[in-house]
Amino acid sequence: YAMKRTLVPEILAAYRSLALENDIIVIEGAGSPAEINLHENDIVNMGMAKMAKAPVLLVGDIDRGGVFAQLYGTIALLKEEERAMVKATIVNKFRGDVALLRPGLTMLESLTGKPVAGVLPMLDVDIEDEDSLAARLERRKGDAVLDIAVIRLPHISNFTDFAALEATPGVGVRYVCEASSLGAPDLVILPGTKSTIADLRWLRQSGLEAAVKKLAARGVAVIGICGGYQMLGMRISDAEGAEGGGEIGGMGLLPVETEFANEKHRTRVRGTALETGGILAPLSGAQLEGYEIHMGRTLLSEDATPLVRLENGMPDGCQKGNVYGSYLHGFFDSEGCREAILGALAAQKGVSLQAEPFDLKAYKERQYNLLAKRVRENIEMNMVYRILDAGV
């Protein structure tokens, strides 16, 4: 918290880089712009809007209740120069007849001096949304023929890795945080994490490490992604103190060792799937792409089997029997990759998934188009465009 203001030059550099490439930039705030106890060092709401000299649309979530108090109270608590930057309000996630809201909207406009740009109804669209993460974690699919258990680590990251699996017909994805609820899935996934060592300790203390190892010994496929891959190895060392220092033994399911470093590796990658066995065998020779974001490096033993040969010639990932690990986020987004893995799991189980391929990109496009259509129908877009043209 104390270092937030020191990040401003980096934030401005990122903003200016985006501004060189785009005509319109949408800046999404975080939480409320009227947290008066945090106002002085704000860099994500009105603070960012001031840095970018951006006009503001204030959006209130009516589904949580008290939307008029939210909008009026927020504007009242802003400083005068910030109130002037707010050009209009929007009511989001409304259920019911908008006519019932109109008297309140008229009063809100009178009280704030700001027009209401529209009322967006609650929409049934499948779009990755951090604000609905809790509901997503509890979601169940009644028609699932394949059961995939993702270990819900305390510092789990990159939920988007599993969106493609969640959207695939016939595939059920559960997020598991207790050994007693792990059950007998067809596939266990150890996801990425913002704190590998702390989450490995939690995995051990919760009994989930033992439960996952028991399933692996019975032949259940286990895949680790990024931090999950690191956990599956023999050892993790943190000589530079990236996560507090020290060393910890891994789960011992893959013949690899990880050495942390303070510098984070971030890059988009492409590669070719190597010849392996088990559920990844159908991928041999397939072109894969994704991105890496991790600290340090993972070293394979001499007799280890890598999963992917990257374009730069380096290996990625490792396989031993029915256990697999990789640094590639977005592993399941590739249609061919996902279909091959799910098809192999279905064949092992003796069930069949739908015959028609599931086109994730087309599915996502339909969801975004539906959202755009509803926004155009319910928001006064001409007002929004005028606000954009006028600026602050």
Name each model-derived stretch.
Residues 1-51, 62-76, 81-83, 96:
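ATP-dependent carboxylate-amine ligase catalytic core
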Residues 175-187, 195-197, 201-206:
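Glycine-rich phosphate/ribose-binding loops and adjacent secondary-structure elements
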Residues 193-279, 284-289:
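Cysteine-nucleophile active-site neighborhood
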Residues 24-26, 57, 90, 189-191, ...:
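Structural motif
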